[in-house]
Amino acid sequence: QELLDVDGEILRNGGSYYILPAFRGKGGGLELAKTEGETCPLTVVQARSETDRGLPASIWSPPRIAIIRPGFSLNIEFRPRNPSACHRESSLQWKVEEESQQVKIAVKEDARGFGPFRIRPHRDDYKLVYCDEGQKR
């Protein structure tokens, strides 16, 4: 089965996409925000406005394959056109913090091998899941 974007195009390994809710009126895309005393926005959150697409994200699988399929282990990394000064020391690659279970961005020295995120079919759309040691969270 192929994963398709909102334009009906096949998801490409390393492609840049906006991650949006499946239904209108449920908020916007994903972006970064400051939480819990952070001095820079490091937490992945959903934009409140449905007209805000959020930040573009690169979705890639470590194996060098052209097309992303359901269940592949994926890394996700924001790729803003103009990163802020706060993010020059960050990779913008997603990681899940064990204690809080929040999705954050990684500092450069922690940046590789975080996944595994997966895209799974869900009803007529897809859901993004985090898997740790084969367990869905």
Swiss-Prot record:
Pfam families in UniProt: Kunitz_legume
Family label: Belongs to the protease inhibitor I3 (leguminous Kunitz-type inhibitor) family.
UniProt name for this protein: Kunitz-type trypsin inhibitor alpha chain
Keywords noted in UniProt: Disulfide bond, Protease inhibitor, Serine protease inhibitor
InterPro entries to which the protein is assigned, alphabetical: Kunitz_inhibitor_STI-like_sf (IPR011065), Prot_inh_Kunz-lg (IPR002160)
PANTHER family in the record: KUNITZ TRYPSIN INHIBITOR 2, TRYPSIN INHIBITOR A
Protein's organism: Neltuma juliflora (Mesquite)
Keyword Ubl conjugation found: no
Subunit structure: Heterodimer of an alpha and a beta chain linked by a disulfide bond.
Organism classification: Eukaryota, Viridiplantae, Streptophyta, Embryophyta, Tracheophyta
Gene3D superfamilies: 2.80.10.50
GO molecular function terms listed in the Swiss-Prot or TrEMBL record: serine-type endopeptidase inhibitor activity
Function, in words: Inhibition of trypsin.
Site (Reactive bond for trypsin) location in chain: 64-65
Disulfide bonding pattern of the chain: 40-86
